[in-house]
Amino acid sequence: AETRNFALRDKKGNEIGVFTGKQPRQAALKAANRGHKDIRLRERGTKKVHIFAGERVKVKKPKGAPAWMPNEIWKPKVKKIGVEKLDEI
């Protein structure tokens, strides 16, 4: 599977950033970790917009984490809401 580019869109449809990942969810997790809540990702080269609800929560660091890692880390969570088809980009 190739790495795909997903353009992050705001409510007006402006593309405000690009996140990469093999799956839309992987890109959505990266967007959520930057603090985006309403995540709309358009796959490059298509008219599909994948819609996710994102959040990030503070969790304790995992067992076996390296010593330099802080005790609490941000963990992104996303929930897929659906896919929209655009008439034009």
Curated annotation (Swiss-Prot):
GO molecular function terms listed in the Swiss-Prot or TrEMBL record: DNA binding
GO biological process assignments: DNA protection
Keyword Zinc included in the entry's annotation: no
Keyword Signal: no
S-S pairs: none
Keyword line: DNA-binding
Xref: Pfam families: MC1
Superkingdom, natural source: Archaea
Protein's job: Protects DNA against thermal denaturation and modulates transcription.
The protein's name: Chromosomal protein MC1a
